[in-house]
């Protein structure tokens, strides 16, 4: 199992604003060019209503946990070949942990 360090919410907020916000939201169910991340943890990949996922995402058989998100964020295209995700990923462990900390709090409101 992947060990994830404690993330920093404020750092994660800044990462989200600069790297994710152009395509995703966490505080509503309304999709942008990428799906909403509202309530993502515990949900299956490719299941947010109102978003047209790639077959790779729909057929991934992944439940989003902190661990799966951590691994995915390192290199989305490698983790899920065929995904529409255009983001190259976050190489730094701390950045991924920080972003997950932010998404975890904001997506559960």
Swiss-Prot record:
Pfam families: Cytochrom_C (PF00034). It is found in: Mitochondrion intermembrane space. InterPro entries: Cyt_c-like_dom (IPR009056), Cyt_c-like_dom_sf (IPR036909), Cyt_c_1A/1B (IPR002327). GO terms for cellular component: mitochondrial intermembrane space. SUPFAM superfamilies: Cytochrome c (SSF46626). Binds 1 heme c group covalently per subunit. Heme c binds at residues 20, 23-24, 85. Keywords: Electron transport, Heme, Iron, Metal-binding, Mitochondrion, Respiratory chain, Transport. Its main location: mitochondrion. PROSITE patterns: CYTC. GO terms for molecular function: electron transfer activity; heme binding; metal ion binding. Belongs to the cytochrome c family. Monoheme cytochrome that may play a role in the adaptation of adult worms to low oxygen tension. This is Cytochrome c type-2.
């Amino acid at each position: 199992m992947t060990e994830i360090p404690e993330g920093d919410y404020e750092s994660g907020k800044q990462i989200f604003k600069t790297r994710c916000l152009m395509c995703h939201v966490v505080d509503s169910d309304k999709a942008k060019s990428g799906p909403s991340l509202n309530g993502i943890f515990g949900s299956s990949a490719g299941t947010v209503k109102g978003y047209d996922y790639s077959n790779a995402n729909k057929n991934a058989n992944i439940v989003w946990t902190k661990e799966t998100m951590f691994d995915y964020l390192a290199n989305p295209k490698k983790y899920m070949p065929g995904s529409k995700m255009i983001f190259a990923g976050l190489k730094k462990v701390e950045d991924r942990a920080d972003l997950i900390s932010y998404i975890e709090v904001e997506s559960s409101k």
